[in-house]
Amino acid sequence: MLGAWAVEGTAVALLRLLLLLLPPAIRGPGLGVAGVAGAAGAGLPESVIWAVNAGGEAHVDVHGIHFRKDPLEGRVGRASDYGMKLPILRSNPEDQILYQTERYNEETFGYEVPIKEEGDYVLVLKFAEVYFAQSQQKVFDVRLNGHVVVKDLDIFDRVGHSTAHDEIIPMSIRKGKLSVQGEVSTFTGKLYIEFVKGYYDNPKVCALYIMAGTVDDVPKLQPHPGLEKKEEEEEEEEYDEGSNLKKQTNKNRVQSGPRTPNPYASDNSSLMFPILVAFGVFIPTLFCLCRL
């Protein structure tokens, strides 16, 4: 007889299957598979203190995080929805909008976020490259209160085209000090998140939020098949190279031939025989010469 836990597990599995079969418009943004399994992230929306959909409208993601409309609209930079025509890999279908819109600027730009309480926080930056199709086309830095927390970000080089990429930056605020990535600075109540103009095109961001907690509390993107395969191939290549090196070394050892014998370790009697022969020939010859 099945226990209560087995019946409950079967019911949840059937509900997930049913939700997957329903079109997104019917099941709504809050009823995705992540919503069924949302018990693990039940407190996530409450821990998020600030969230913005850069270049886009307000949106509530599958985890319940409420992204507000971009406060820089009409003030700084330009909004773009160029990515709306593209599907975004690694993202939940309901949340692709967070990566399809963006804000960029021809100069350094950023956001100010007031922080009232001390504690541990995490800054999550969301990106997707929807325009360029090769690396070294858009490269920029990200600064947090003057600290460079992301250096030379090349989104395409990291994950490829139209693929979600999150930068997760933990920090702590205590006793008037901001600590991030091993650096400390004076904190005056506001976080300044800057996207720094570099040599390659313009800086941008798709969405971002700040939450109280640690990196372990941040929802992760879906796995990237291309990156996983590449990592596996690199591991196999390193293993093969090591094996080949070992085999080659052994092969070279065989080809080098047997060890050269030590001449000092051989028997000295083998050297005495030619000496005795020479001495035996020399004495009679000398005797004959003396009689002449």
UniProtKB/Swiss-Prot annotation:
Lineage: Eukaryota, Metazoa, Chordata, Craniata, Vertebrata
Membrane topology (UniProt): Single-pass type I membrane protein
Presence of keyword Glycoprotein: yes
Region of interest (Disordered), ranges: 221-265
Signal peptide (UniProt feature, chain positions): 1-28
Amino acid composition bias (Polar residues), ranges on this chain: 245-265
Lumenal membrane side: 29-269
An MF annotation (GO) of this entry: enzyme binding
Subunit description: Interacts with the oligosaccharyltransferase (OST) complex.
Transmembrane portions of the chain: 270-290
Alphabetical list of Pfam families matching this protein: Malectin (PF11721)
Biased composition (Acidic residues): 231-241
Name recorded for this polypeptide: Malectin
Disulfide pairings: none
InterPro entries referenced in this protein's UniProt entry, alphabetically: Malectin_dom, MLEC
Family: Belongs to the malectin family.
Annotated glycan sites: 268
Keywords per UniProt: Carbohydrate metabolism, Endoplasmic reticulum, Glycoprotein, Membrane, Signal, Transmembrane, Transmembrane helix
Role, per record: Carbohydrate-binding protein with a strong ligand preference for Glc2-N-glycan. May play a role in the early steps of protein N-glycosylation.
Subcellular compartments: Endoplasmic reticulum membrane
Main location: endoplasmic reticulum
Cytoplasmic side: 291-292
Binding site for a carbohydrate: 82, 104, 131-132, 201
Species whose genome carries this gene: Homo sapiens
